[in-house]
Amino acid sequence: MKTARRRAREFAVQGIYEWELNPDRPASLIEKHLRENEYFAKADEALFRSILYGVLKDVELLSAQVGRYYERAEDEVSPVERAVLLMAALELTQSPETPYPVIINEAIEITKTFGGTDGHKFVNGVLDKLAAEVRGDEVLAQKQRRKQD
């Protein structure tokens, strides 16, 4: 069963994807369209809104952050992968209360649901590098805990 937070992230990714394909469309219309889905009521609305509006507000900064770690040409990154990466970049940089492994795992699972065959591997690689940059202390602590186990 999907959690309310997973649903919120999935709807946010769909909204970011929709915006990527039609950047002149206002976020409020994208949100209205997504709310028509019968499962939207089961999503964490506050998280959905913070991700959708946060990504669209800071898209240039977030794009630059994830783009540094692409190991392929930017035009080879699918719109789904890009939407997931933008969502996760926002959470990694602006939601320190959410552990980075949770953010990366959610991004991988959403990419498996909506993306291409191996898109999740690309997303994982980019986000691992971004997490090391923006949450270095947390990543280091996690690695040290793993060594002790």
From Swiss-Prot:
**GO CC term (a single one):** cytosol
Organism encoding this protein: Chromobacterium violaceum (strain ATCC 12472 / DSM 30191 / JCM 1249 / CCUG 213 / NBRC 12614 / NCIMB 9131 / NCTC 9757 / MK)
Task: Specify the protein name.
Answer: Transcription antitermination protein NusB
The record, for InterPro entries, names: NusB-like_sf, NusB_fam, NusB_RsmB_TIM44
Q: What does this protein do?
A: Involved in transcription antitermination. Required for transcription of ribosomal RNA (rRNA) genes. Binds specifically to the boxA antiterminator sequence of the ribosomal RNA (rrn) operons.
Any one biological process term the GO annotation gives: DNA-templated transcription termination
Question: Domain of life of the organism in this record?
Answer: Bacteria
Which protein family is it in?
Belongs to the NusB family.
Instruction: State the UniProt keywords alphabetically.
Output: RNA-binding, Transcription, Transcription antitermination, Transcription regulation
